[in-house]
């Protein structure tokens, strides 16, 4: 709440100026007169009291207690301004302060207008889009440094009546203008609207408005996590990136939440509308729980959806570059390659025109093939890339010097030269030293694409005509190197890449050989990028049925639920099935959970409380075994963020006639399970995952 603009204003009516030395009874009489004239909107009303007592923390606390928690604003609640102790002069003054704040809100409302006709006291008109807003300069100057500089400096806006503002939504401007004039910031649960209000408050220097907006976005994020609503959480993350708001400042677990539910977030409709920045952050993170081939399919689909917009943006940038080049250097300099795109230059990159021979731009036009080749002799160009700062090392050391030397010697890249890349012993020694200091953290951006160099091999400039022409190759060059290719099965990777037709057949063959090299700890190259060390494996993915299961609300007719998950492996005669229990925290122990079938046998889970408040979990048979059975069992209590999960496993050969239960007598502390949110889903339940694998029988 913005208190200062409210409590620093003192109303001095004509009847009060000559009565400053009256006793307390006169003060109380003036307060009564003020109550009778509470609806007046005149600032100079003769019935307003003079606030003589200095403002203390108790007064501010009482005002803070009046605000309504929803919507989040800094207004005074009219229904909570009654004081039970009317005989105390201090309490009477507190009431006056509360009424003063309310009157201030009502009074300065006349300075705010949103109609075709200006209000009586407005002296400036803002035109935002197709709407006009009327306001008072004195209020704007008093509350915002931005408007203070606009109206008190030498800017042309200080002398004109109507000001046109661009780059702001009319609804956002009206919300912030209302907050400036009457101290009310109306925030709903639309994260796009709230993030825009945050940005505009930041522009105007309204610190308290930023705090209120940030707090609201934190509540929105918490609501998405508790539902849970993966698609909306992904929307929020992308909105924060577009608004340049740090994700962790809104909610510390928002990023990890989206990554843990990757099987949902990468297949939802919201995924295809996220920005390139958000996609790159997702692919860089080791906490992305999804199989690499599935990630590849989702990335290709995203590139198809966003290629048209990307191509249009590149064409606009190229036109602007050509226009500026024509104006500065003449017609000859204006005929640059149409396959060149906007680039960020490294501090140590020596580019003298050879940037048009980059792998990321050389494949757009068959007619420009010769133009690309004529620049090869100039050396490898250094350009900016989303992958430029990826590094596992905690030090500031980079490979720029090594890259320069390699470029001068002809560079090492894909094709026939990839064998030379792995023979650089000095580089490998440096990488080994840095690997010792590496620590993994799912909550932070992390990538093993530590460094790369652009290939200058002429054989790499061949253009494949049967590529998928619907995809922007520049987008592919940005995101494909972030895929963890070495995590793939070679046969599946070849089949998938061959069907997609997104890279040349020669590069597919080289890629498969490089996958084998990376598995041996050697250098890894792909699409002209040279990776200094193999990347880390991602975390274990969960089946999509599991993720969908724990994101659905409980059936109100049952206490607990069991969700059978599809079999996800079957080899060498083994079969594996998972069964997900969702258990209410208030379940009465001991309890027998719902039954399920596996290998034509009936099983169920028993929960018991053991000594010292320990939860015991047992696997029980529905009937006696008619023949021996060998199985392995994995039981897991799935934490809200997955990495907090608790797992226990055993392998057991059950003899014929067995009809008892087998399990873990001390699984998890009940106090930990019930009281800590990290194991809670929907705040009133926890998840138990049972995984059974048959050995034989």
Curated annotation (Swiss-Prot):
Superkingdom: Eukaryota
GO biological process per UniProt: aggregation involved in sorocarp development; calcium-independent cell-cell adhesion via plasma membrane cell-adhesion molecules; cell fate commitment; cell fate determination; culmination involved in sorocarp development; sporulation resulting in formation of a cellular spore
Organism placement in taxonomy: Eukaryota, Amoebozoa, Evosea, Eumycetozoa, Dictyostelia
Compositional bias of kind Polar residues: 58-72
Name of the gene this protein is made from: triA
Biased composition (Basic residues): 332-344
SMART domains in the cross-refs: BTB (SM00225)
Organism, as annotated: Dictyostelium discoideum
Domain BTB, chain residue ranges per copy: 122-189
Phenotype reported upon loss of the gene: Mutant shows pleiotropic effects that include an inability of the spore mass to go all the way to the top. The upper cup, a tissue that derives from prestalk cells and anterior-like cells (ALCs), does not develop properly; it is unable to lift the spore mass to the top of the fruiting body, likely due to defective intercellular adhesion. The differentiated state becomes unstable; prespore cells transdifferentiate into prestalk and vice versa. Cells that find themselves in the wrong environment sort out to the zone that is appropriate to their new identity.
One Pfam family linked to the record: BTB
Name of the protein in its database record: Trishanku
Described purpose of this protein according to its UniProt entry: Required for normal morphogenesis and cell-type stability.
Biased composition (Acidic residues): 416-453
InterPro entries given in the database record: BACK, BTB/POZ_dom, MATH/TRAF_dom, SKP1/BTB/POZ_sf
């Amino acid at each position: 709440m913005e208190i200062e603009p409210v409590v620093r204003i003192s109303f001095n009516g004509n009847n009060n100026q000559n009565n400053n030395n009256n006793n307390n009874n006169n003060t109380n009489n003036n307060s009564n007169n003020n109550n009778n004239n509470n609806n007046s909107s005149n600032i100079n009303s003769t019935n307003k009291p003079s606030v003589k007592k200095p403002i203390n923390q108790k007064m501010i606390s009482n005002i803070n207690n009046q605000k309504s928690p929803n919507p989040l604003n800094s207004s005074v609640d009219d229904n909570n301004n009654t004081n039970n102790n009317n005989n105390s002069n201090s309490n009477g003054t507190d009431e006056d302060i509360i009424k003063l704040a309310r009157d201030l809100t009502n009074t300065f409302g006349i300075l705010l207008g949103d109609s075709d006709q200006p209000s009586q006291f407005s002296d400036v008109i803002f035109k935002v889009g197709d709407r006009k807003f009327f306001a008072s300069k004195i209020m704007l100057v008093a509350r915002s440094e931005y408007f203070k500089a606009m109206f008190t400096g030498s800017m042309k806006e200080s002398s004109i009546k109507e000001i046109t503002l661009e780059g702001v939504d009319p609804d956002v401007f009206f919300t912030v203008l209302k907050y400036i004039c009457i101290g009310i910031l109306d925030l709903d649960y639309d994260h796009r609207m709230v993030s825009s209000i945050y940005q505009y408050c930041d522009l105007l220097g309204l610190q308290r408005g930023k705090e209120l907006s940030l707090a609201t976005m934190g509540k929105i994020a918490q609501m998405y996590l508790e539902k849970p609503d993966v698609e909306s959480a992904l929307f929020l993350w992308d909105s924060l990136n577009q608004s340049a708001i740090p994700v962790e400042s809104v909610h510390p677990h928002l990023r990890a939440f989206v990554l843990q539910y990757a099987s949902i977030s990468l297949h939802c409709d919201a995924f295809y509308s996220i920005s390139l920045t958000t996609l790159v952050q997702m692919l860089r993170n080791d906490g992305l729980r999804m199989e690499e081939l599935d990630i590849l399919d989702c990335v290709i689909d995203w590139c198809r959806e966003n290629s048209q917009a990307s191509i249009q943006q590149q064409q606009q940038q190229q036109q602007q570059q050509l226009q500026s080049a024509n104006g500065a250097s003449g017609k000859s300099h204006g005929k640059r390659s149409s396959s060149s795109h906007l680039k960020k230059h490294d501090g140590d990159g020596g580019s003298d025109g050879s940037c048009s021979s980059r792998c990321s731009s050389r494949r757009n036009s068959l007619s420009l093939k010769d133009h690309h080749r004529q620049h090869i002799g100039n050396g490898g160009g250094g350009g900016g890339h989303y992958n430029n700062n990826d590094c596992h090392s905690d030090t500031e050391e980079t490979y720029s010097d090594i890259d320069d030397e390699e470029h001068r010697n002809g560079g090492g890249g894909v094709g026939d030269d990839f064998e030379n890349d792995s023979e650089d012993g000095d580089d490998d020694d440096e990488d080994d030293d840095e690997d010792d200091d590496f620590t993994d953290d799912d909550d932070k951006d992390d990538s093993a694409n530590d460094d790369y160099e652009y290939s200058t091999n002429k054989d790499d400039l061949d253009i494949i005509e049967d590529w998928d022409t619907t995809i922007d190759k520049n987008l592919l060059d940005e995101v494909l190197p972030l895929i963890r290719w070495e995590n793939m099965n070679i046969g599946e990777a070849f089949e998938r890449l061959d069907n997609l037709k997104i890279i040349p057949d020669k590069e597919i063959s080289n890629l498969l050989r490089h996958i084998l090299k990376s598995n041996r700890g050697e250098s890894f190259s792909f699409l002209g990028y040279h990776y200094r060390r193999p990347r880390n494996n991602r975390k274990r993915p969960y089946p999509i049925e599991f993720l969908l299961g724990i994101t659905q609300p409980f059936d109100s007719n049952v206490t607990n639920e069991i969700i059978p998950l599809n079999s996800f492996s079957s080899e060498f005669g083994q079969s594996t099935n998972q069964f997900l229990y969702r258990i209410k925290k208030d379940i009465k122990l001991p309890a027998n959970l719902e039954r399920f079938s596996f290998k034509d046998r009936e099983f169920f889970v028993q929960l018991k409380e053991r000594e010292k408040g320990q939860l015991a979990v047992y696997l029980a048979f529905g009937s006696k075994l008619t023949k021996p059975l060998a199985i392995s069992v994995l039981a897991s209590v799935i934490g809200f963020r997955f990495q907090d999960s608790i797992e226990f496993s055993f392998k057991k050969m059950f003899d014929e006639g067995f009809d008892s239960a087998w399990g873990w007598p001390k699984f998890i502390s009940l106090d930990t399970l019930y009281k800590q949110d990290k194991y809670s889903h929907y705040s009133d339940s926890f998840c138990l995952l049972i995984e059974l694998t048959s050995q034989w029988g």
